[in-house]
């Protein structure tokens, strides 16, 4: 592992604890390293000096849709591309507005979407790809990362906060649907992810 892996992993763990200041501080410390990346213009792999904090996320972290379709989200052109660092900074900005009682419904909804999308079920799996976590896009997650990456607690926390501040039926219906998605995922966790070979829950 290199220093970038270490700082990035600390930032990822801090994010899932909702310790956003700590996540930002750790992500900012990722150093520049030489990385092989695909150059679309030349169609070849090239070496570039990059920081892990500057890695572009493949989808808008704050969008929430009826259907989870990673490929659909990744194919869309982003009006505002987010890096791992700018994503964290935007979450901090929204959480500050919530603390100031500023447009709580919309900010809580968007932060809830951020936590949902950064889970295994969302469109931002790339956020948690890290050599120390040992995650890089497989169809499942490692046993030791299940609670971290399959958990819906933070998404539900912010969706419930948004629900409390909903002012019309459309807003209430939207939150009800998003909460239903988290409950569906919790069912999937129990039915498929948290069972060992004997069928007992972890």
Predicted regions and their residues:
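Extracytoplasmic/secretory-pathway proteins
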Residues: 1-202
């Amino acid at each position: 592992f290199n220093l970038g892996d270490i700082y990035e992993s600390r930032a990822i763990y801090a994010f899932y604890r909702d310790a956003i200041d700590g996540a930002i501080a750790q992500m900012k410390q990722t150093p520049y390293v030489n990385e092989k990346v695909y150059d679309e213009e030349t169609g070849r792999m090239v070496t570039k000096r990059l920081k892990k904090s500057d890695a572009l996320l493949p989808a808008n972290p704050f969008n929430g849709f009826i259907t989870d379709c990673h490929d659909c989200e990744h194919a869309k052109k982003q009006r505002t591309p987010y890096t791992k660092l700018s994503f964290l900074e935007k979450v901090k900005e929204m959480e500050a507005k919530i603390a100031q009682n500023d447009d709580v419904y919309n900010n809580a909804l968007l932060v809830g979407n951020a936590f949902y999308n950064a889970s295994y079920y969302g469109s931002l799996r790339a956020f948690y790809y890290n050599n120390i976590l040992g995650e890089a896009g497989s169809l499942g997650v490692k046993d030791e990362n299940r609670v971290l990456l399959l958990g819906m607690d933070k998404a539900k926390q912010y969706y419930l906060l948004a629900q409390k501040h909903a002012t019309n039926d459309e807003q209430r219906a939207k939150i009800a649907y998003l909460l239903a998605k988290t409950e569906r995922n919790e069912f999937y966790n129990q039915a498929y992810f948290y069972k060992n070979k004997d069928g007992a829950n972890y």
